[in-house]
Amino acid sequence: MFPGVSVELHKHGRPVKIHLVSTGAVCVKRKFRDATKTGVWAMIDFMLDKKFTEWMPIWVMIVEHPAGLFVIDTGENADVNNPGYFKSSGLFANWFDTTQFKFDVEREEQVGPQLEKLGIKIDDITSVILTHLHLDHIDGLKYFPNTRILVNKYEWDKPFGDLPKLYPSWFKPTLVELNERFEVFDKAFYLTPEKDMVLVETPGHTYGHCSVIIDCDEARIFFAADICYSQDQLLNERYSGTNAKHALAQNTYSKVKAFSKGRKVIFIPSHDQHAGERLKMLTPIF
């Protein structure tokens, strides 16, 4: 439904290949994506909404970097539409996740087959980086039982909206503390020795939500995960209806815009239909 995009960029003249693949598609209640209220009122508003958005991608980013092979988020899997998939998570979660979302995921769209198409062996992957612990970002973990998986410790300690019953039984991620600073971002963890790939805390959607920034010669690639549903939301100060804390989301918006002004930043939210084209054309926020 959403074709993948691959670009070859550089860092100090060395190639950095970036692949963006969609592990199926999702649609949500319209007021889930585009809220007119905040907090509990936003939740009530979207639960009463009877209309869904159009189909949106579930992007996963794969980075072939001189320091290693990195997978950012793992996307969704085809079992999500199986009857009873959410029952282990309790009555409310089962009701919520079967009435507020719709998924369309084929087996070949899962992250494992997508990596195979790219000629990437799972055993060669250096790390999987999870931006946060929501379903459509962790549901491809089954392909990575022997891979180092990085999670922000704060996201792990104070989750929001996660479904741990759906984690693989072996899932014990490496918890990282974001105790450094990167430009406007107060909390950061460097993923490469040259500090050209960095995990930054971008809270709002969850308390410990993170994004990944890749600093290349041509541009900075900003994998934003669920900061917002689209670049348009960011630019027009519109918010989703499911933020853990609205004030945190507002602050993150301000930081992203401050970071992006005066430089070439390619902004890639996980569910933005136009993100692939922006990556292909290296179209910046400003």
Where are the regions a protein language model picked out?
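Active-site metal-binding loops of divalent metal-dependent hydrolases
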Residues: T23-G24, T74-N77, L133, E155, ...
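Metallo-beta-lactamase
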Residues: M1-I120, D124-D136, Y143, A219-A225, K261, ...
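Conserved nucleotide-sugar donor-interacting segment of glycosyltransferase catalytic cores
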Residues: I138-N146
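Cap/insert and terminal regions of metallo-dependent hydrolase folds
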Residues: A78, P83, A93-V111, D217-F286
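Glycine/small-residue-rich hydrophobic helix-like segments
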Residues: L178, E183-Y239
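C-terminal/domain-terminus segments
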Residues: V5-V16, A35-T38, L150-V151, W156-F171, ...
